[in-house]
Swiss-Prot record:
Family matches, as InterPro entries: Cystine-knot_cytokine, TGF-b_C, TGF-b_propeptide, TGF-beta, TGF-beta-rel, TGFb2, TGFb_CS
Organism for this UniProt entry: Mustela putorius furo
Protein name: Transforming growth factor beta-2 proprotein
Residues linked to a glycan: N72, N140, N241
Any single biological process term in GO: regulation of transforming growth factor beta2 production
Similarity comment text for this entry: Belongs to the TGF-beta family.
Gene3D superfamilies from the UniProt entry: 2.60.120.970, Cystine-knot cytokines
A Pfam family recorded for this sequence: TGF_beta
One Gene Ontology cellular component: extracellular region
Cysteine disulfide links: C309-C318, C317-C380, C346-C411, C350-C413
C-alpha cells in the first residue's frame, strides 16, 4: 500500500517537473517577425564587419557591366547549387565561415580577340585546354575560401552522339616520363544537342596550388570519360587510338562554325549572343581583417538531426515565410542588389513526451534546478540555411559579397 502511494507521489512529482521544464518562450507571429528583421539587420552588419550602415551616397546612374557580371554569375551559381541539393535531398553545410566573402571573377583570355578573327589552324577533337591568369590574386592566396570554374555548354545540333560524359582535369607539370600529366577533378554527363547550360566545377584545390606556386598553373583540360588517347602537355599533342571525339561545344572556346550552320550573318548573330558567356573563375576570399576574427572565434559544427516537413498552417514547429525588403524593413538604400530576399524564420511548438519510467526526466529535473534560466525542452530552430549574394557601395566603390547562412530553408526541434 505504501509502495503504491509512494509511486503515485513520485509520478505526480515527475510530471509536474517535466511541465515546468518547457522554458522556450512563445511569441506571436508579429513579434517573431520583428525580432527576425532586427536579427537580420545585425547579422548583415556583423558579417561585413560594419558597426553601422555605410553613409548614404547618390546611387550610380549605371553599374559597371563587369560588376553586374560578377554579381549575376555568383547569384546564378548559388541558385544552381541549391537546385541540385534539393533534387538530391542534400543539405547546405551550416559550418561555413561566418563573415562575408569577397567575390572576384577572372575571365579566360579570349581565343578569338575580334569578330573577324580566324580560328586557330589546329583543331583538338578530343579535348579542350582552358587557362587563367590568377597572378593578381597571389597576395591573397591564404584568404581563398572557394574557387569555381564555370563554362557554358552550347547546343550542338551537329553532334553525332546525344550524350557524353565530360571530365575536368588539372594539367600537371611533369617531372619525368613516368610522372602523371593530369589530375582528375570532376565529371558531368551532358546532352550535346540540348539547350545550352552553365557547368560548374569546384577547383579550390587547383587554384590554391596556383596561387602558391605560379609555375604549376598550366590550366585545365576538358575531355571525355575515356578518350583512350595519350595526352602530352609539353606540346599539346595527343596519340589517338580511335578515340570518341568531344561533341560538346563551349562558349568562348570553340569557334562558332564548329556548332552553327548558316551564313556569315547567322554566325555573327550567334557569336554576339554568346559573347557574355566566357569561361571564368569565381574566387571567394575572406578579407584579412575578417580572417583574423574567424580564426579566433571559430564556430563549432552543429549536428544535423532528422528533418521533418511541416506545413505553415500548423501551430507546431515549421518554416514561416518572411520577405525582407532592405529599403522598407531596414531603411537601407546602400544595398544595390538584390532589393530584398526571402529570409524566412522558424516558429512553433515542439511537443515533447517525457518518459516517467526512465531516469531521463529525473536528470532533466535536476538540470532545470541547476540551470533555471536554460531551456531543457526542445525549441524550434533553423536547420538548413543558404547563402545570399549582395552588391553594395562603400562611397563610390562597388563591392560584391557572399553572406553565409542568410536564407532559412527548413526547421527542426532541438
Amino acid at each position: 500500500m505504501h509502495y503504491c502511494v509512494l509511486s503515485a507521489f513520485l509520478l505526480l512529482h515527475l510530471v509536474t517537473a517535466a511541465l515546468s521544464l518547457s522554458t522556450c518562450s512563445t511569441l506571436d507571429m508579429d513579434q517573431f517577425m520583428r525580432k527576425r528583421i532586427e536579427a537580420i539587420r545585425g547579422q548583415i552588419l556583423s558579417k561585413l564587419k560594419l558597426t553601422s550602415p555605410p553613409e548614404d551616397y547618390p546611387e550610380p546612374e549605371e553599374v559597371p557591366p563587369e560588376v553586374i557580371s560578377i554579381y549575376n554569375s555568383t547569384r546564378d551559381l548559388l541558385q544552381e547549387k541549391a537546385s541540385r541539393r534539393a533534387a538530391a535531398c542534400e543539405r547546405e553545410r551550416s559550418d561555413e565561415e561566418y563573415y562575408a566573402k569577397e567575390v572576384y571573377k577572372i575571365d579566360m583570355p579570349p581565343f578569338f580577340p575580334s569578330e573577324n578573327a580566324i580560328p586557330p589552324t589546329f583543331y583538338r577533337p578530343y579535348f579542350r585546354i582552358v587557362r587563367f591568369d590568377v597572378s593578381a590574386m597571389e597576395k591573397n592566396a591564404s584568404n581563398l575560401v572557394k574557387a569555381e570554374f564555370r563554362v557554358f555548354r552550347l547546343q550542338n545540333p551537329k553532334a553525332r552522339v546525344p550524350e557524353q560524359r565530360i571530365e575536368l582535369y588539372q594539367i600537371l607539370k611533369s617531372k619525368d616520363l613516368t610522372s602523371p600529366t593530369q589530375r582528375y577533378i570532376d565529371s558531368k554527363v551532358v546532352k550535346t544537342r540540348a539547350e545550352g547550360e552553365w557547368l560548374s566545377f569546384d577547383v579550390t584545390d587547383a587554384v590554391h596550388e596556383w596561387l602558391h606556386h605560379k609555375d604549376r598553373n598550366l590550366g585545365f583540360k576538358i575531355s571525355l570519360h575515356c578518350p583512350c588517347c595519350t595526352f602530352v602537355p609539353s606540346n599539346n599533342y595527343i596519340i589517338p587510338n580511335k578515340s570518341e571525339e568531344l561533341e560538346a561545344r563551349f562558349a568562348g572556346i570553340d569557334g562558332t562554325s564548329t556548332y552553327t550552320s548558316g551564313d556569315q550573318k547567322t554566325i555573327k548573330s550567334t557569336r554576339k549572343k554568346n559573347s557574355g558567356k566566357t569561361p571564368h573563375l569565381l574566387l571567394m576570399l575572406l578579407p584579412s581583417y575578417r580572417l583574423e576574427s574567424q580564426q579566433s572565434n571559430r564556430r563549432k559544427k552543429r549536428a544535423l538531426d532528422a528533418a521533418y516537413c511541416f506545413r505553415n498552417v500548423q501551430d507546431n514547429c515549421c518554416l514561416r515565410p518572411l520577405y525582407i525588403d532592405f529599403k522598407r524593413d531596414l531603411g537601407w538604400k546602400w544595398i544595390h542588389e538584390p532589393k530584398g530576399y526571402n529570409a524566412n524564420f522558424c516558429a512553433g511548438a515542439c511537443p515533447y513526451l517525457w518518459s516517467s519510467d526512465t531516469q531521463h526526466s529525473r536528470v532533466l529535473s535536476l538540470y532545470n534546478t541547476i540551470n533555471p534560466e536554460a531551456s531543457a525542452s526542445p525549441c524550434c530552430v533553423s536547420q538548413d540555411l543558404e547563402p545570399l549574394t549582395i552588391l553594395y557601395y562603400i562611397g563610390k566603390t562597388p563591392k560584391i559579397e557572399q553572406l553565409s547562412n542568410m536564407i532559412v530553408k527548413s526547421c527542426k526541434c532541438s
